[in-house]
């Protein structure tokens, strides 16, 4: 079952934690590529010095963050890697959850082709934000997509009822965020080999 607007229209920390174990589905040329989300980070609006919308800096890039929760926010880093985020919270409250890594469930051959790697090491496919986006064919063309209405990309509950030990941690590579550097707003599954970094 797809996640609904009610799920997304909550604060980023709650959604980031609750997205662990959910499935990211990308429909690509009639094939479903599916990853279980194993690693997330919350970015908590204008007060959060690590957030793109810190001090309500509203730009063309961040405009989608001001929508109500349930939209895709994709941006490029280092001119190379696309980063996939989920807009959360209420209209005009710019919060997002960054999806750092996933565990491939379905469509592994296509993911491998998308990543252009020969290695059969499954963990190499999606164990980081750039790798995940490349494997799942996530790019700027998906920016602003409605995750509830879209058939191209969406999030859903997993059919299994696995339980996970979720570890809270500091977010990665935001040393500039001063007191927000130490917030435990990253969540990942303990001992999962697809987590980006431990």
UniProtKB/Swiss-Prot annotation:
The keyword Cell membrane does not apply. GO terms for biological process: base-excision repair. It holds the Pfam family Pur_DNA_glyco. The keyword Hydrolase applies. It is an enzyme of class 3 (hydrolase). It comes from Natranaerobius thermophilus (strain ATCC BAA-1301 / DSM 18059 / JW/NM-WN-LF). Coiled coil: none annotated. GO terms for molecular function: alkylbase DNA N-glycosylase activity; DNA binding. This is Putative 3-methyladenine DNA glycosylase. Its EC number is 3.2.2.-. Belongs to the DNA glycosylase MPG family. Keywords: DNA damage, DNA repair, Hydrolase. InterPro entries: Formyl_transferase-like_C_sf, MPG, MPG_sf.
């Amino acid at each position: 079952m797809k996640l609904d607007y009610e799920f997304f229209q909550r604060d980023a920390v709650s959604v980031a934690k609750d997205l662990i174990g959910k499935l990211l589905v990308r429909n690509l040329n009639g094939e479903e590529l599916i990853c279980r989300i194993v690693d997330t980070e919350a970015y908590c609006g204008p007060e959060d010095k690590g957030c793109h919308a810190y001090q309500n800096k509203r730009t063309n890039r961040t405009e989608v963050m001001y929508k109500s929760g349930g939209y895709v926010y994709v941006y490029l880093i280092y001119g190379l890697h696309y980063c996939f985020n989920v807009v959360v919270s209420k209209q005009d409250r710019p919060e997002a959850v960054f999806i750092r890594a996933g565990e491939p469930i379905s469509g592994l051959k296509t993911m491998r082709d998308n990543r252009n790697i020969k290695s059969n090491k499954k963990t190499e496919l999606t164990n980081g934000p750039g790798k995940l986006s490349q494997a799942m064919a996530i790019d700027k063309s998906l920016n602003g997509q409605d995750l509830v209405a879209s058939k191209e990309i969406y999030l859903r509950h997993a059919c299994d009822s696995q339980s996970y030990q979720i570890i809270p941690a500091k977010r990665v590579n935001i040393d500039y965020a001063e007191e927000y550097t130490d917030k435990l707003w990253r969540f990942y599954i303990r001992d999962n080999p697809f987590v980006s970094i431990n």
